[in-house]
């Protein structure tokens, strides 16, 4: 009873704090109020409180249930929200410049936690005895790496999608201008790196001409930060996803006698891994660097949700123990 009450208190505290912080982040991000230092710092401290609240929630559930809290969809969503909070903490300690990563991590954490604590999953918060397939020491290793990988890849993909939107708004012609052909638009979209390098050089020239605070310069700095963080966060998420898939193979061999069973969850995880491997290849290989890598990220963003929720919605395969239909 005590653990259950404590769990509810921590859930409400973390959700209330992050709900209060979210409008502050959107306001400071859109209006660009750098002079309101205390206002922005207070929102950062709110996310720190949320991080410790979710951490306490997970530890409380761990002690109460007697196993690592990653046995169903509700617990994995809370852990995913915690993963976004960790990514936010990284940007919190980077005080050298204004970081737009916060505008992605804060709403992601609140939306995921809000969905987990909503009425859609009202039967799942109660902790239950693990099914035999999950009673293994590989549970913590495999599932935690996969969820951390999902969180990092989702965050990096959202940054790339934001980069894609900014680029699309720049190159898309007005609907009344018939002189600009669709082919030119597609060339701009699929060869973004070349376009970005040209614009950055142009902005540097403007900076030398005392136009460093112009609208184009501000936009260039935004694009540079989005590209910087998306590549590094996706690289980290790719490592987590790789370790998660490898640990799953070892666990599957111990449980079912086969390293790979082409289960729907395994298949979609492999497809997701392949897409982000292509993205990293594009970013690190100069010969194919002209391809618009954020488009690959956008595809990967959709694949992650298919991999994460697809099996749970269908309720099929070896990973159907945490599905909606099973509850």
Curated annotation (Swiss-Prot):
Molecular function per GO: heme binding
Residue intervals passing through the bilayer: 13-33, 46-66, 73-93, 101-121, 146-166, 226-246, 262-282, 298-318
Main location: plastid
Entry coiled-coil feature ranges: none
Pfam families, alphabetized: Cytochrom_C_asm (PF01578)
GO cellular component, one term: plasma membrane
Tagged with keyword Kinase: no
UniProt keywords, alphabetically: Chloroplast, Cytochrome c-type biogenesis, Membrane, Plastid, Thylakoid, Transmembrane, Transmembrane helix
Top-rank lineage group of the source organism: Eukaryota
Location of this chain's protein in the cell: Plastid, Chloroplast thylakoid membrane
Entries under InterPro entries matching the protein: Cyt_c_assembly, Cyt_c_biogenesis_CcsA, Cyt_c_biogenesis_CcsA/CcmC
Topological relation to the membrane, as annotated: Multi-pass membrane protein
One Gene Ontology biological process: cytochrome complex assembly
Subunit and interaction comment: May interact with Ccs1.
Family of the protein in this entry: Belongs to the CcmF/CycK/Ccl1/NrfE/CcsA family.
Function of the molecule: Required during biogenesis of c-type cytochromes (cytochrome c6 and cytochrome f) at the step of heme attachment.
Name listed for the protein in its UniProt record: Cytochrome c biogenesis protein CcsA
Organism per entry: Draba nemorosa
Gene: ccsA
């Amino acid at each position: 009873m005590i653990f259950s009450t404590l769990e509810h208190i921590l859930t409400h505290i973390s959700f209330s704090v992050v709900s209060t912080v979210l409008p502050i982040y959107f306001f400071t991000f859109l209006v660009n109020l750098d002079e309101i230092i205390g206002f922005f710092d207070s929102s950062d401290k709110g996310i720190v409180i949320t991080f410790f609240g979710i951490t306490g929630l997970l530890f409380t559930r761990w002690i109460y249930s007697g196993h690592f809290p990653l046995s169903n969809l509700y617990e994995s969503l809370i852990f995913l929200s915690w993963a976004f909070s960790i990514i936010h903490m990284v940007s919190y300690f980077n005080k050298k410049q204004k970081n737009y990563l916060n505008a992605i991590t804060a709403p992601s954490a609140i939306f995921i936690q809000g969905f987990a604590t909503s009425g859609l999953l009202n039967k799942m918060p109660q902790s239950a005895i693990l099914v035999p397939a999950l009673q293994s020491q590989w549970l913590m290793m495999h599932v935690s790496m996969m969820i951390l990988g999902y969180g990092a890849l989702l965050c990096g993909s959202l940054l790339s999608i934001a980069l894609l939107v900014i680029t699309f708004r720049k190159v898309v012609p007005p609907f009344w201008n018939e002189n600009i052909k669709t082919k030119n638009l597609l060339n701009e979209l699929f060869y973004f790196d070349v376009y970005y390098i040209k614009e950055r050089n142009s902005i540097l020239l403007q900076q030398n001409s005392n136009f460093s605070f112009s609208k184009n310069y501000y936009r260039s700095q935004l694009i540079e930060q989005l590209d910087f963080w998306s590549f590094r966060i996706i690289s980290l998420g790719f490592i987590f996803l790789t370790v998660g898939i490898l640990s799953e193979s070892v666990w599957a061999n111990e449980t079912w006698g086969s390293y790979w069973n082409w289960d729907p969850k395994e298949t979609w995880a492999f497809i997701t891994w392949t897409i982000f491997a292509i993205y990293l290849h594009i970013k690190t290989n100069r010969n194919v660097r002209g391809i618009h890598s954020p488009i690959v990220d956008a595809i990967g963003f959709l694949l992650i949700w298919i991999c994460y929720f697809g099996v749970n919605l269908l309720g099929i395969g070896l990973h159907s123990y945490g599905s909606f239909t099973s509850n």
